[in-house]
Each structure stands twice: as structure tokens, then as C-alpha cells.
């Protein structure tokens, strides 16, 4: 009998799962599974989901691709995090940009910082995404909903 190893037997992104679990634990009353039972209800949903997916997903000869697929399924990849992003203020993007870019893309009056109306929405979105991509995983999580809070197959 040939035993094909599961993803969880070859690798498991413990650090990322731990960070997501911590974010879910901080939600206290907003946790999804607490009312479902004594044992499973105490485990963060992202941890339960990642273990089940890690057990069901076979490992291939390409560990990097396996990890990409695993993170994509759990919306923990770059695009998934962006999809989960609740919103970044114009002020945060403004502070991150160079002085030249600030003048080009923003209007400042007193303490009010707003996007310049002459910029296409796609350009504002591109700069916001660029700022988001420059953040560490921990910093990105501050702007993100939990995976189960977004629409779609999460």
C-alpha cells in the first residue's frame, strides 16, 4: 500500500495560522465556533479549517506551489488578504508616499486629507494596494476581516 503524504505532514505555516488564530481569539464574543460545543468551540475556526485542509490536501513534489495553494484556499495569500481588507484611510496612504506623490494625488486643507478628484479611482486603488502590500503580515491583519467574515468560498 502506497502512502501519499498530506500537506500537513510535509509543511504547515504555523506562524501564519498562529497569527490568524490570535486575531480570532481577540474577537471574544465575535468568535464563530464558541456556541457549537465544548471542545471544538474552544478552537479558533481558522485553526480547525487549516488542519482539516492540511490533512485532506495531498503533498506534491513542489512544496512552494503546495503552500501557495494552501494559503489561497484559506484566503491568507496576498490576494486573499487584500480581499479581506476592510479599508485603508487616505491619510495612511498619504503619510506613506513621497512628497512629490502627495502633491500629485492628494488635496490637503488644514487637517483634512483627501484624494485629488482628478485621479482615476483605479490609480487611488493601485496606490492603496501598493501601501497594503508594503506592510508586514501582522500589520495587514490589523486592516483585515477574519476569513470567515468575507463573502465567497472561504
Regions found by a protein language model. Give the residues of each.
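S-adenosyl-L-methionine-dependent nucleic acid methyltransferase catalytic domains
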Residues: 1-154
Amino acid at each position: 500500500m502506497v502512502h501519499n503524504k498530506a500537506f500537513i505532514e510535509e509543511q504547515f505555516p504555523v506562524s501564519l495560522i498562529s497569527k490568524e488564530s490570535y486575531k480570532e481569539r481577540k474577537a471574544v464574543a465575535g468568535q464563530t465556533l464558541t456556541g457549537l460545543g465544548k471542545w471544538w468551540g474552544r478552537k479558533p475556526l481558522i485553526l480547525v479549517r487549516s488542519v482539516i485542509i492540511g490533512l485532506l490536501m495531498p503533498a506534491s513534489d513542489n512544496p512552494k506551489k503546495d503552500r501557495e495553494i494552501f494559503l489561497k484556499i484559506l484566503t491568507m495569500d496576498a490576494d486573499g488578504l487584500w480581499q479581506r481588507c476592510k479599508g485603508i484611510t487616505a491619510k495612511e496612504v498619504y503619510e506613506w508616499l513621497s512628497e512629490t506623490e502627495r502633491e500629485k494625488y492628494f488635496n490637503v486643507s488644514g487637517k483634512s486629507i483627501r484624494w485629488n478628484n482628478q485621479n482615476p479611482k483605479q490609480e487611488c486603488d493601485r496606490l492603496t494596494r501598493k501601501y497594503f502590500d508594503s506592510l508586514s503580515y501582522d500589520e495587514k491583519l490589523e486592516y483585515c476581516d477574519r476569513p470567515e467574515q468575507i463573502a465567497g468560498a472561504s
